[in-house]
């Protein structure tokens, strides 16, 4: 009786390449040394490091999400809905990761926050230029939000460009118009540097789309946008709750009304007609 051939023994793993002429290829690509030396705390409280790193991580997620939404907007301009939907779906996973960034800060007590709050000076999240670009892409625009960045020419120029470009939602509505759906001229020709305001006609268009085949391309686009909008709403509410726990109703570090200002922001829906149309389907 012949013996079955035995599988060859797994070879021992090769020793990884450890000797490099300069810095490692990983470092050259990721620049981890740069990233991990950007933390310059201004107090002796150990909690400040957590606050600072968490905020920096949020900024990185803002950057990725802006990239995705700009990719989606460009695809929509070219009538490439699948590419736009793919970018929006990626941004949903990234928004989930962004929202999870609140966890290290979600249960700060006033005493803990006060231990290093003075180090923030007048610094405040609403001064984030990359977050502002996110808001502009969502259609929530205000020229006054450029003012804090007047002393930073590159940042100011990027924000000014974003202010005057169509938002992601503007590109969606222009696509619907090109596909033969009723989008009023007042919406299509509006001043895109202004905050988007809801339209009854746009609501009727989404109602018609949602009354049809749920697997249709534009219906799937609508759901991808709704997923984005929901997570933006959750981000705003997580910010509100974390702030309320850490400082109550005190004024914000940047001179805002703090919780009252965040409450007003949290009440706003992104892509409003995608929500109101559901009442008519």
Which residue ranges define each predicted feature?
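Surface-exposed peri-terminal alpha-helical interaction modules
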Residues: 2-281
């Amino acid at each position: 009786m012949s013996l079955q051939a035995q599988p060859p023994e797994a070879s021992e793993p090769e020793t990884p390449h450890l000797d490099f002429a300069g810095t490692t290829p990983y470092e050259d690509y990721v620049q981890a040394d740069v990233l991990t030396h950007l933390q310059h705390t201004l107090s002796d409280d150990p909690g400040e490091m957590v606050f600072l790193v968490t905020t920096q991580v949020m900024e990185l997620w803002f950057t990725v999400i802006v990239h995705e939404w700009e990719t989606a907007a460009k695809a929509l301009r070219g009538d490439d809905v699948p590419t736009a939907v793919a970018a929006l779906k990626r941004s949903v996973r990234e928004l989930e990761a962004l929202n999870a960034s609140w966890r290290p800060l979600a249960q700060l007590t006033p005493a803990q926050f006060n231990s290093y709050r003075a180090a923030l000076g007048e610094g405040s999240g609403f001064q984030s230029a990359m977050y502002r670009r996110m808001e502009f892409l969502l259609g929530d625009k205000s020229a006054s939000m450029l003012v804090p960045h007047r002393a930073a020419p590159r940042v100011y120029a990027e924000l000014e460009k974003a202010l005057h470009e169509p938002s992601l939602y503007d590109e969606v509505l222009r696509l619907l118009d090109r596909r033969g759906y009723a989008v009023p001229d007042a919406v299509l020709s509006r001043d895109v540097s202004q905050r988007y305001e809801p339209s009854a006609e746009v609501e009727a268009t989404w109602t018609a789309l949602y009354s049809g085949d749920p697997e249709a391309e534009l219906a799937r686009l609508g759901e991808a946008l709704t997923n984005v909008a929901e997570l933006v709403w959750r981000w705003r509410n997580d910010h509100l709750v974390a702030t309320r726990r850490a400082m109550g109703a005190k004024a914000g570090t940047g001179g805002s009304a703090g919780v009252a200002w965040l409450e007003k922001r949290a009440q706003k829906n992104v892509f409003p007609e995608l929500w109101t149309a559901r009442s008519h389907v």
